[in-house]
Amino acid sequence: MANIVLEIPEELSGLVSAVQALVDVVKTEVDRARTGGAVDYAAFERRIAEKSAEVEKVGHQIALSALAVSAPQVMINKVLHHRVLAETETRFMSLAGAVAVKRSLYRPSGQRNGPVVDPVALRAGAVDGVWLPATAREMAFEVQQRTSREAEASGKRLGRLPYSHASFEHVAHTVGERYVGQHRQIEQALIEVFEVPEGAKSVSVSLDRVSVPMEEPRSRPPGRPAQGAPKRPIERVYRMAYCGTVTLHDEHGESLYTIRYGTMAAGDPAGLCEGMAGDVVELLAKRPDLKVMLLCDGAPEMWNLLDAEFTKEPFGAAGKVVARLIDFWHVIEKLGAAARVIAAETEVKPLLASWKMRLCNTSSARLAILEQLHESGKEDVLVGHDKPVHEAITYFTNNAERMDYAAARRQKLPIGSGNVEATGKTLFNVRMKRSGSRWKSRTGEHIVHLRALALSDRWDAAMDRALKSPRVVIRVAA
């Protein structure tokens, strides 16, 4: 059988042996297959992946070397730099593994202790000087999904990102730090280019809290520390973090798309609400016909935070926020507990079903149910340490103006805050409440923000902006 000649430019000659090794692996497998013997295709998959990775690494080596300069003096963005280290080898980290590249290092002229510049890393947009941008992006994506040790194991199994758990941890938080530092600007840019789904008719804004295990310093007991006592005693405590959603709904109140937000307990919930309000303003600029509603549980803190933003312009205008609702299922939960006190066991379900029906179809139902709770005369009945009827009365009294579910249904608006409830579970519980896990505020904030991007289908667009390489012009100085 005749061979096909592949011409490779001399400057890319390093690829020849790697490509030949890949061809040889495939040819060997083809020859073995034609003999009709036993085939271990899984082993072939691994071999071809290894050889393909070698081709990839050689390609990176050649391309990165082309970014290098080695002149004694260069102009970098019109600033004179002199060489401080010539033709020294370093390793850049790619998706396929480490790549050795020779490069020179430079320092601004006249600055004895000025920052050292690596032209290759600068031009390639390497994160932290050695991690190639796509590699850093994917490592951060892995760590927002799972622990760094699981990411390490996955990388080794797949033959991609073959790095240690410490490297995954370091790179993910480096990317997280870079994103968090500019997240407001990036979120603004993302919402400006967002295309509102054609079928969107309303937008709901929700806010909730979720507990997160935190690592905090523990006070030492008085007296001299016991032998073997930890030098830095800590304790694992739960603090309440915040999550929010902006959800677009169709003509039936069903969710079309949700933007998810989060911040740690020591974060900035007011800033989170400001960001959500800003996104809704942009959505209204694109679609002024969208109906805006606020939807969350009955916690006063949540409503105070939302109202601080959604009573300002443009939301202060009459009719701009068409509904403010307590989550329907939180209300039913309160009523269910009260019904078990008021009614006989066989009447609990019919009574609760009646209340549900009335709330969904009659605007005055909330007042009628409140009166029924009062008339039961069982406000002081204890169930364990709770007074279910008293709690339901208090809930209805404090939130009656946020329970007009019948009016919301007539406008085809949602009445349940399931989107933010689900966000609390997927954003925090799934990733941050693993057995034995504990978090610090700064690094936890990195993961929360990165995970919110991934869950909102905004990862690539956000990383394009967060890891965007600065424009670099390098010229050899005369």
Segments (PLM) and residue ranges:
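Catalytic center-proximal scaffold of phosphoryl-transfer enzymes
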Residues: 1-65, 105-478
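An N-terminal low-complexity regulatory-tail signal and nearby short nucleic-acid-interaction modules
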Residues: 65-128
